[in-house]
Amino acid sequence: MAQAIADELGVKLEVSSMSFDNVLTSLQTGKADLAIAGISATEERKEVFDFSIPYYENKISFLIRKSDLEKYKDLDSLASANIAAQKGTVPESMVKEQLPKAQLTSLTNMGEAVNELQSGKVDAVHMDEPVALSYAGKNSDLAVATVSLTMKEGEANAVAIKKGNSDLKEVVDKVIQKLKDDGTYQTYLEKASKLTEVEQ
């Protein structure tokens, strides 16, 4: 998607890889023009950044050990569990808000969180559902729990843009709409689901 936006703008794409919790800071300080990292357009973030039209309606799930499927069937069973989530993300804030008695382990890398789950250091990892399904599909000892927390409405993933840059937002919106309309974005999703295991 970033390449398609760069092509539309007629500029060379420069991608900076960083931990999720540094992404929005880099945008805010002017080190980046756009942030595309599975960022939910929350009301809190909208006060600081502009956002494109949504490109993905996110679903968030708990990845657990398959042997614990019967153990974690409702929110009460997760109330005092040790839950890992990626630092600075909506899944992390959902655990803080909806499971305040749970022991939260905030990590910068999803692969690390899954390793902690498999080694028994945490009981569950709260993450984007497509990523959770991919991990479960490739690791016979893992499964996606049937219980989930409540997503707030309107918190779809969108491209974050520095506040007030309406010209850039207009171009980004146009590109996203085109990618969704012509089926290219669906192809991106399919490729992404195959790549989620690379970091593990």
Residue ranges, per PLM feature:
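Extracytoplasmic small-molecule ligand-binding "clamshell" domains
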Residues: 1-38
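Flexible hinge/capping segments at coil-to-helix
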Residues: 52, 66-83
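Periplasmic-binding protein-like
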Residues: 57-64, 129, 133-177, 193-200
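Short helix-initiation/N-cap motifs at beta->coil->alpha
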Residues: 14-25, 70, 90, 105-115, ...
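Short helix-loop capping/hinge motifs at secondary-structure junctions, enriched
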Residues: 66-74, 105, 164-170
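Ligand-binding clefts/hinges and TM-proximal coupling segments of bilobed small-molecule sensing domains
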Residues: 90-105, 143-148, 176-200
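Hydrophobic residues within well-ordered alpha-helices
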Residues: 5, 27-28, 78, 117-118, ...
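A ligand-binding cleft/hinge motif common to bilobed small-molecule-binding domains
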Residues: 39-48, 94-97, 118, 123-153
